[in-house]
């Protein structure tokens, strides 16, 4: 294997949407960084089975619905 081509692997803190925190190892961020999740398995309709609305971050959901909403299911 080539030397010095792999990213640094360190411990970070992950904060779920309900405030639950846990530590894991990752190449994301730097040692001790905090990753705040906007959508996770506790809030995503695919895992909750609900028909709840997704939070529209940056207009992405609105843009999608505007473009494909007329197709219907």
From Swiss-Prot:
Keyword DNA repair recorded: no
Pfam families: Ribosomal_L31
MF annotations from Gene Ontology: rRNA binding; structural constituent of ribosome
Keyword Ribosomal protein: yes
Any one Gene Ontology BP term: translation
Annotated Gene Ontology cellular component terms: ribonucleoprotein complex; ribosome
SUPFAM superfamilies from the UniProt entry: L28p-like (SSF143800)
Keywords annotated in UniProt: Ribonucleoprotein, Ribosomal protein, RNA-binding, rRNA-binding
InterPro entries: Ribosomal_bL28/bL31-like_sf, Ribosomal_bL31, Ribosomal_bL31_A, Ribosomal_bL31_sf
Functional note: Binds the 23S rRNA.
Quaternary context: Part of the 50S ribosomal subunit.
Family: Belongs to the bacterial ribosomal protein bL31 family. Type A subfamily.
Protein name according to UniProt: Large ribosomal subunit protein bL31
UniProt source species: Rhizobium rhizogenes (strain K84 / ATCC BAA-868)
Species lineage: Bacteria, Pseudomonadati, Pseudomonadota, Alphaproteobacteria, Hyphomicrobiales
Gene designation: rpmE
């Amino acid at each position: 294997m080539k030397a010095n081509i792999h990213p640094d692997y360190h411990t970070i803190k992950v904060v779920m949407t309900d405030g639950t925190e846990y530590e894991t190892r990752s190449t994301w961020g730097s040692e001790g960084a905090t990753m705040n999740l906007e959508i996770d398995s506790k809030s995503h309709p695919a895992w909750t089975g609900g028909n709840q609305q997704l939070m529209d971050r940056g207009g992405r959901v609105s843009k999608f619905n505007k473009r494909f909403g007329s197709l219907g299911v």
